[in-house]
């Protein structure tokens, strides 16, 4: 058999085995009747799903999974999840699902990340085949949930400023004051403790002087973020 060396099969004394290129036994049937055509076809089909995890097919399926969830298509998302599971790649599927929960659902449904994490944990405790159930639950939840990418957009905008050299000194009133001599250095002298004020908020500057007025976070149009925006507009004024 190509790729696995010599294989000595004595019909009637060993189980029938179908070997694939990676030398892994995919189909075995007890008895002396040999391998049927159906056995070989099934083994070949499953072998084709065992893609190179460092190759294009691996990333294509993960990409299609995330884009299907992002596009709110639960049927397509289930299809690509099934392809990953049938290829034996539950780990990559689970990792990508954790990313999707924060990147694509995000603040539109903040509880989603915790639910997906719980489903992923359950999947690893159960193992396949039962693991498919909580993973499917998580995929359907994300595909049918409201979407927001405001978190990834916000952090990427902040990182872009840092990488461009726009950082600046931390305002003195925000610096650590737990050590002796901190106040002599002017640290924390004018800090206002928000919990001492109505609605637990007081106007003060938090960004470095060089970034004064920078806005990284933009409220998404979903119900959850708009509720937060409305709440703070009543307290701070229009954002």
Language-model features: locations:
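Inter-lobe coupling/hinge segments of SF2-like helicase ATPases
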Residues: 33-38, 46-59, 73
């Amino acid at each position: 058999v190509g790729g696995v060396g010599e294989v000595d099969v004595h019909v009637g004394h060993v189980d029938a085995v179908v070997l694939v290129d990676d030398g892994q036994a995919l189909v075995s049937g007890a008895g002396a009747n040999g391998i049927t055509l159906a056995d070989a076809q099934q083994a070949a089909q499953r072998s084709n799903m065992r893609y190179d995890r460092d190759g294009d097919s691996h990333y294509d399926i993960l990409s299609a999974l995330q884009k299907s969830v992002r596009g709110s298509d639960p049927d397509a998302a289930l299809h690509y999840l099934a392809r990953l599971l049938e290829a034996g790649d539950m780990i990559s599927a689970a990792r990508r699902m954790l990313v999707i929960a924060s990147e694509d659902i995000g603040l539109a449904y903040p509880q989603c990340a915790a639910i997906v994490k719980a489903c992923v944990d359950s999947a690893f405790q159960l193992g396949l085949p039962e693991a498919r159930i909580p993973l499917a639950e998580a995929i359907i939840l994300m595909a049918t949930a409201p979407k927001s990418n405001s978190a990834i957009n916000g952090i990427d905008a902040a990182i872009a400023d840092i990488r461009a050299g726009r950082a600046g000194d931390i305002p003195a009133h925000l610096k650590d004051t737990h050590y002796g001599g901190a106040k002599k250095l002017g640290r924390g002298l004018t800090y206002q403790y928000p919990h001492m004020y109505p609605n637990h908020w007081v106007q003060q500057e938090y960004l470095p002087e060089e970034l004064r007025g920078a806005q990284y976070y933009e409220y998404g149009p979903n119900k959850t973020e708009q509720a937060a925006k409305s709440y703070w507009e009543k307290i701070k004024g229009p954002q």
